[in-house]
Amino acid sequence: LDTFTVAAVETITENAKDIGITAKNITDALAIATHANVTISGTLPATSTADIASIAAILATNGKVTANVAAGKAADLITAIAGAGAADALTLTLTDVTVAATDLISLNSKTSVAINANSVKTINGTVADLTKVYVTNKSSFTALGNEDVSITHVIPATPISASDVNSIAKATTGKVTAAVASGTAKDLLAALKDTNGKDDLTITIGDTVADAKDLLALAGKTSKPLVITSVTDVNGTVA
């Protein structure tokens, strides 16, 4: 008589279409092999209440879950895979055109697989959150780097430092929208080296005396007129 121990079961596999209502076929197996990994072939739907209940049941395992989740909006996917963790290998594809950086960060914490963000055309977020998306976790997303970015404020009406704006502009070829903290023309010009005329930046010059060439160069860094109310004298040559 051959015997086996439940501890020997390392992975439970099933096709997405055969998992049963609320993933009963998976949960029944997990009731026996409680620490097994779960691998689902096919694509798990994630739209209805029943779909979400099935995914939640699968993610309740103590092991790693490997699965492809149907494409969807970031907010919906966050709800659908709430029980997932960074060790799970969930393939996620976004359908959003506009998405919050916080949602991207949240999804990234739920999977070890790079998230497909090809549909995204605009990202909104604070500098801290955008930095997590574009710098800290850059490899966690695919197809990012050509979308527009709107930098929001931690405190309303508080401008963003020029260096922070530039770090985001450097990460995308899209348009960057932000209110830049006031500074001297020379300092702003040096800090905003990766911005250009497509960017929608509110740039406020803090000088009372400025060089014409610096003002002209800064004007080429934004699609908006410069705010130069503090400037009383401009030095330069007649062109």
Show the residue positions of the predicted features:
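General marker for long, soluble alpha-helical cores
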Residues: 1-239
